[in-house]
């Protein structure tokens, strides 16, 4: 099978339309118009902080679970190191919006964000291997695009500065590298029709999770 062609097909048919739907959601439509409430922006900061903490724990579990496999151990170690500062970057954004440390300490994940974190942990613990990277490819492609949107319109409409927006400027660059790495791993791993189906399902599920996450934040922080 042509793994590279399959990856490109998934990007064209699933990931890119998913990004378009996210950008057309009411969360980002209101962001561009300058009408998105500070409360809903704070909601993203809190929920993404909690999600990033869960990701770190997932990668730590992946390191332990795969200690016998040097390649996978190295992979989870790399991911852990890459993500280690991200909870604090999300928190920094929230603090710039007026949140306090106790807001993060007292917070719990909303249902839709629990689903996102659970999917990440599921992929780590069930040993999905390279095929499960379709979730990461999709998620990080969407993060990269929405980081551009946040970076542009939080400056334009909300007057935030470089320091407050560090999370987004980092992800505009880093996630391009991460998506390229995921695409390469997936392309090498796809060998059978079932593999292709798993890749497409992982991408489709992550689009649904991401769309649900932002709608959930919009509603929970009304």
Role assignments for model-derived ranges:
Residues 1-222:
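Non-heme di-metal
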């Amino acid at each position: 099978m042509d793994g590279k062609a399959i990856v490109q097909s998934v990007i064209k048919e699933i990931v890119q339309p998913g990004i378009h739907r996210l950008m057309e959601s009411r969360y980002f439509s209101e962001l561009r118009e300058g009408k998105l409430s500070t409360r809903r922006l704070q909601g993203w900061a809190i929920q993404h902080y909690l999600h990033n903490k869960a990701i770190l724990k997932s990668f730590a579990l992946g390191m332990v679970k795969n200690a016998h496999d040097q390649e996978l151990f190295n992979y989870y170690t790399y991911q852990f190191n890459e993500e280690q500062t991200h909870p604090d970057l999300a928190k920094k954004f929230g603090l710039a919006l007026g949140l306090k440390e106790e807001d993060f300490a007292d917070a719990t994940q909303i249902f839709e964000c629990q689903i996102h974190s659970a999917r990440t942990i599921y992929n780590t613990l069930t040993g999905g291997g390279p095929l499960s990277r379709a979730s990461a490819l999709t998620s990080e492609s969407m993060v990269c695009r929405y980081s551009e949107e946040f970076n542009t319109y939080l400056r334009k409409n909300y007057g935030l500065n470089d320091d407050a927006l560090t999370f987004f400027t980092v992800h505009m660059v880093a996630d391009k590298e991460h998506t390229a790495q995921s695409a390469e791993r997936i392309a090498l791993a796809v060998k059978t029709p079932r593999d292709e189906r798993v890749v497409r399902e992982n991408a489709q599920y992550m689009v649904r999770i991401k769309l649900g996450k932002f709608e959930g934040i919009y509603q929970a922080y009304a």
